[in-house]
Amino acid sequence: MKKISGVIMDWAGTAVDYGCFAPLNAFLKVFSEEKGIDITYRQAREPMGLLKIDHIKAILSMPEVNEKFRALYKRDWNKRDVDEMYTSFEKHLFASLKDFTTPIPGVLETMAMLREQGIKIGSTTGYTAKMMEIVRPGAEAKGYRVDNLVTPNEVPAGRPAPYMIYKNMIDLAIPSVDQVVKVGDTIADIKEGVNAKVWSVGIVTGSNEMGVSEEEYNSRPAEEWESLKKEVRERMLAAGAHFVLDTIAELPACIEKINNRDQA
């Protein structure tokens, strides 16, 4: 029987930055200030988890956004537009990243429980290595540590490709995909896990897919969020998630269930 020996965590929206607001705010500013195009929160969030330059391309490719661009500039967007917007995105993101490194409630306790079981903690992200030079130390100062980090810069392609997971497995000496759980809060996270053939687990509360700040979430009764949570669960399951958990605190029990299922 192959028990789970490695958990690969996403960063923003899963481990830190409740609601995944650091990149959201930067994307909104870039489209508004750089190109004069207002995009919705939903449009900005939909491609979350991708390498950030790919995220910009994905938003520009949305029919409504593409139509606005063509109406404003009388042409299609091109690589130069993407490069200019990405430069502006980095400026906005780097200015605020340090403020979005607080661990999401339950993460520190859950990671401690996994480590007690001898489980290694790897990580993947849509952030670049330079961005993680801010995020990782900020999170570590608040108690969150991983055993390994892989950024899109280190592999042939970022999410939803499986390469960052595979590199984590090599770095952590985990020989089988059956021994790995990928945990994330975006559709790109789910697909990354599915494409790697590992166990793919989605987290709802605090996620980009839910798109709610911690303050807003705590200001309303839990039952008022059930409809939105149901929508998020359905999207994650449709993307191929093996399990969708309400919070990260449910992860140890989920891993136990996987181990027992494998034994059966």
From Swiss-Prot:
Organism placement in taxonomy: Bacteria, Pseudomonadati, Bacteroidota, Bacteroidia, Bacteroidales
GO biological process: DNA repair; organic phosphonate catabolic process
Known cofactor(s): Mg(2+)
Catalytic activity, as annotated: phosphonoacetaldehyde + H2O = acetaldehyde + phosphate + H(+)
Species in which this protein is naturally found: Parabacteroides distasonis (strain ATCC 8503 / DSM 20701 / CIP 104284 / JCM 5825 / NCTC 11152)
Gene that encodes it: phnX
Function in brief: Involved in phosphonate degradation.
Name this polypeptide is given: Phosphonoacetaldehyde hydrolase
HAMAP family (alphabetical): PhnX (MF_01375)
Domain of life (superkingdom): Bacteria
UniProt subunit comment: Homodimer.
Keyword match S-adenosyl-L-methionine: no
Family statement: Belongs to the HAD-like hydrolase superfamily. PhnX family.
Catalytic residues as annotated in Swiss-Prot or TrEMBL: 10, 52
Binding sites annotated in the UniProt record for Mg(2+): 10, 12, 185
Cofactor note: Binds 1 Mg(2+) ion per subunit.
Keyword field contains Cytoplasm: no
InterPro entries with a match to the protein in the record: HAD-like_hydrolase_sf, HAD-like_sf, HAD_sf, PGP-like_dom2, Phosphonoacetald_hydro
Gene Ontology molecular function terms on file: magnesium ion binding; phosphoglycolate phosphatase activity; phosphonoacetaldehyde hydrolase activity
Gene3D superfamilies to which the protein is assigned, alphabetical: HAD superfamily/HAD-like (3.40.50.1000), Putative phosphatase, domain 2 (1.10.150.240)
